[in-house]
């Protein structure tokens, strides 16, 4: 795959940049660690730029990877606008506010109730005011690992650029015109599975020629190590059938429907308890749905786990 992406780059050792948000516990973040461990560092110099140096997986970054320093402006995106105003980030705060208002208007017009437009607009509206990332470097390949993909497109110099998709686009609400303009500037779009590819192309068929399949990478030694460390948590002590779901608490994962599904299964006479490992913006929604279905004893949120 890398040979295909770098086929026109003549140097012996290639210079790569990977950009992502942070390294909190999550499937995409774990996949990034796997990707970093898979590089042959005799052939590639790999720089990693994170918007924030945060998360439990920071310690998993391979020593051969060059972790670039934080750039203060990019850390603003994760904090409340009111706070960033007090910190003196006036222009970026106003850009975020403009993006928030534009996203709210778009969602209202299209009757979206839980869209990803706000996140996209947060990056889109602040991007013009962000500094360049490694402004003196021209990379052979730059990878934007998590959407939105504006920063690698506009703030990185590279001969080739790839944007990654981890999300099922059949389950999220986006501004198709705006995202089309974002995706079109990339040389390739990396999809983690055939299903993700199919659902992405159902929304963006014009990018069929750009899609390449790069499945999530987990080194064999890492999997063995995690398996040997695994212990069934004391929290999972229910009798009967146990179901475990793991993932980020967001619309695409559909965890908010678990309480109703669990209720229906139990009404049919099956003794099940459903555990949820993860975190995210839908946690309060899931808790509310658990209460509404009266499933407090049978749907249990376990939160973050290092080794689920």
Predicted regions and their residues:
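Nucleotide-activated donor-binding/catalytic signature segment of Leloir-type glycosyltransferases, i.e.
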Residues: 64-68, 287-305
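N-terminal strand-loop element at the rim of the active site
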Residues: 18-25, 43-116
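Active-site proximal beta-strand in glycosyltransferases
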Residues: 141-169
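Nucleotide-sugar donor-binding and catalytic loop/hinge architecture
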Residues: 9-15, 225-242, 266-267
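Donor nucleotide-sugar binding/catalytic pocket of nucleotide-sugar-dependent glycosyltransferases
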Residues: 160-166, 170, 184-226
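A conserved mid-protein helix/loop that constitutes part of the nucleotide-sugar donor-binding site
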Residues: 29-34, 241-264, 270, 281-287
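Short hydrophobic "strand-cap" motifs at the C-terminus of beta-strands
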Residues: 19-20, 192, 214, 245-249, ...
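Membrane-proximal helix-turn-helix segments that form the acceptor-binding/catalytic region
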Residues: 127-138, 150-151, 170-192, 196
């Amino acid at each position: 795959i890398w040979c295909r992406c770098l086929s026109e780059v003549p140097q012996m050792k290639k210079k790569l940049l990977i950009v992502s948000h942070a390294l909190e516990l999550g499937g995409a973040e774990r996949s990034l660690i796997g990707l970093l461990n898979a590089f042959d560092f005799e052939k590639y110099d790999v720089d990693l730029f994170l918007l924030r140096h945060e998360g439990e997986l920071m310690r998993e970054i391979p020593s051969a990877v060059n972790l670039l320093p934080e750039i203060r402006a990019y850390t603003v995106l994760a904090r409340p606008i009111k706070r960033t105003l007090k910190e003196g980030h006036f222009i970026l705060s106003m850009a975020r506010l403009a993006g928030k208002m534009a996203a709210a208007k778009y969602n209202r017009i299209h009757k979206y109730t839980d869209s990803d437009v706000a996140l996209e607009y947060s990056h889109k509206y602040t991007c013009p005011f962000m500094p360049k990332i490694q402004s003196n470097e021209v990379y052979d390949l730059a990878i934007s690992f998590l959407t939105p993909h504006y920063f690698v497109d506009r703030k990185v110099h590279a001969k080739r650029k790839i944007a990654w998709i981890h999300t099922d686009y059949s389950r999220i609400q986006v501004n198709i015109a705006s995202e089309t303009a974002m995706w079109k500037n990339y040389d390739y779009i990396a999809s983690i599975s055939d299903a993700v590819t199919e659902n992405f192309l159902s929304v963006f068929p014009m990018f069929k020629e750009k899609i390449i399949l790069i499945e999530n990478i987990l080194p064999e030694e890492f999997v063995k190590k995690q398996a040997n460390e695994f212990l069934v948590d004391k929290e999972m002590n229910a009798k009967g059938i146990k179901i475990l779901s793991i993932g980020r608490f967001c619309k695409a994962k559909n965890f908010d429907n678990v309480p109703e599904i669990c209720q229906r299964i139990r009404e049919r006479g099956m003794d099940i308890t459903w555990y949820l490992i993860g975190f995210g913006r839908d946690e309060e929604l899931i808790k509310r749905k658990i209460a509404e279905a009266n499933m407090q004893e049978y749907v249990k949120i376990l939160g973050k786990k290092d080794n689920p």
